[in-house]
């Protein structure tokens, strides 16, 4: 969707929360909801909700509100959840194994195709019937298989090296858990998850309370 290029990142960051809450409403058989009611559940202002959704089209009707199932379907389209994304994990340590074992991602359309690691003790072990491969063969695997997203779960000193291999072999999406800011071409999208950043944010908030 070309229009996304003009949408602020702050709006895009809020979309998964809309998706999650709308899914919960559907499971609870809620057919329609006003922006005010959604505001009370999701924690955004009603005005913010209307502005966010208007970025992608006219979804609500005055006096009626939003049709929950239709809005959920549109949110899936906006988030790209109508396709299947082929993924690989590089780094089978604690974080890599936790992601590998989480089946919720597959329900959203993110299929795990392969896992790679440098540790001889891990190579050959299977996680959910996917055998951990030697990272030396990552490039060969990517040349032989189309992969959409690479999930980097390696130490910071290897993060950029792994990223370079992914980019060189056509991977356009990187979910980065390595504590390093990656350098990538403009056509490659990176989502960083620096766990310590989140924890330090919490510690700052706690410190402010005290």
From Swiss-Prot:
GO molecular function term, any single one: DNA-binding transcription factor activity
GO CC annotation terms, alphabetical: cytoplasm
Source organism of the structure: Clostridium kluyveri (strain ATCC 8527 / DSM 555 / NBRC 12016 / NCIMB 10680 / K1)
Cross-referenced SMART domains: CoA_binding
One Pfam family in the UniProt entry: Put_DNA-bind_N
Record's subcellular location: Cytoplasm
DNA-binding positions: 17-56
Protein name: Redox-sensing transcriptional repressor Rex
PANTHER family assigned to the protein according to its UniProt record, in alphabetical order: REDOX-SENSING TRANSCRIPTIONAL REPRESSOR REX, REDOX-SENSING TRANSCRIPTIONAL REPRESSOR REX 1
SUPFAM superfamilies linked to this entry: NAD(P)-binding Rossmann-fold domains, Winged helix' DNA-binding domain
């Amino acid at each position: 969707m070309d229009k996304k290029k003009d949408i602020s990142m702050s709006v895009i960051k809020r979309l998964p929360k809309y998706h999650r809450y709308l899914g919960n409403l559907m499971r609870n058989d809620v057919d329609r909801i006003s922006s005010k009611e959604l505001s009370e559940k999701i924690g955004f202002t009603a005005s913010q909700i209307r502005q966010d959704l208007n970025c992608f089209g006219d979804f609500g009707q005055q006096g009626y509100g939003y049709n929950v199932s239709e809005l959920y379907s549109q949110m899936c389209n906006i988030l790209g959840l109508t396709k299947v994304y082929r993924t690989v994990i590089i780094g089978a340590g604690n974080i890599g194994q936790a992601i590998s074992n989480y089946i919720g991602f597959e329900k959203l359309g993110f299929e795990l195709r392969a896992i790679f690691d440098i540790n001889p003790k891990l190579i050959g072990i299977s996680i959910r019937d996917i055998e951990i491969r030697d990272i030396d063969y990552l490039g060969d695997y990517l040349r032989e298989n189309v992969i959409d997203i690479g999930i980097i779960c390696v130490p910071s000193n290897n993060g950029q090296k792994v990223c370079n291999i992914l980019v060189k072999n056509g991977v356009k999406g990187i979910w980065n858990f390595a504590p390093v800011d990656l350098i990538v071409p403009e056509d490659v999208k990176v989502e960083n998850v620096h766990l310590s950043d989140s924890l330090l944010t919490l510690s700052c908030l706690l410190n402010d309370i005290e």
